[in-house]
Design a protein with these regions (language model features):
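Secondary-structure boundary/capping motif
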Residues: 1, 98, 163-164
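Alpha-helical support elements that line or immediately flank enzyme active sites
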Residues: 1-13
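Short, glycine/charged-enriched secondary-structure capping and boundary segments
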Residues: 7, 33-36, 169
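Short, solvent-exposed amphipathic alpha-helical segments in soluble enzyme
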Residues: 8-11, 105-109, 170-174
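C-terminal substrate-binding/catalytic lobe of Rossmann-fold NAD(P)-dependent oxidoreductases
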Residues: 14-17, 22-155
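C-terminal catalytic/substrate-binding lobe primarily of soluble NAD(P)-dependent oxidoreductases
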Residues: 103, 146-179
Length: 179
């Protein structure tokens, strides 16, 4: 979910630094009831707790978009919902920002070849509304915000399993075409 968002922002505004928070549906390695786990927070009941934990997403971005290596950090908050997550990225850029400029960049990107990967919504929806959405990121333009001239916040929904499965199908199609 973070990669398409970071790509659009970096291409359009040149990200200097940022911090992401993923509000993530609980996962299969979490406990249903309080139990044992090497991470004491993940040992707590997933269905009854907000669980702060680490994420590799911010570091992986540097592998996907080399110009962002070391510029993003992040955390995950596992929440008691079974599916659909939200990533929020607070970022500073070299170029001046406005809510309109940010939303326009995402809307233009979503109309191109990448429309299967990134979508935008202007509707005030909640997590369940994105269940089985095939896009990797759905930018919620109603949540875009700017402070000053170069600090912004973007929010993007994603159905982690379904979006990933759709990208794997895209790769299979591509491999079939080139073979």
């Amino acid at each position: 979910c973070l990669a398409p968002v970071a790509h659009v922002l970096n291409e359009s505004f040149e990200i200097e630094k940022g911090f992401m928070t993923t509000i993530h549906a609980f996962t299969s390695d979490q406990r249903i009831l309080d139990n044992s786990h090497k991470d004491p927070r993940r040992a707590r009941s997933a269905s009854q707790s907000i669980v702060p934990t680490s994420t590799g997403a911010s570091k992986a971005i540097g592998e996907i978009i080399p110009s962002l290596k070391g510029k993003l950090e992040g955390v995950a908050m596992r929440v008691p919902t079974p599916n659909v997550s939200l990533v929020e990225l607070v970022f500073c850029t070299k170029k001046d920002l406005s809510i309109e400029k940010i939303n326009s960049a995402f809307q233009n990107f979503s109309k191109g070849q990448e429309k299967k990967i990134l979508e935008t919504t202007q509707e005030k929806l909640v997590s369940i509304d994105f269940n089985h959405n095939p896009a990797s990121s759905i930018v919620d333009t109603t949540l875009t915000n700017v402070v000053g001239k170069n600090m912004g916040k973007i929010s993007a929904w994603y159905d982690n399993e379904w979006g990933f499965s759709n990208r794997m199908c895209d790769i299979a199609e591509y491999l079939h075409k080139i073979s």
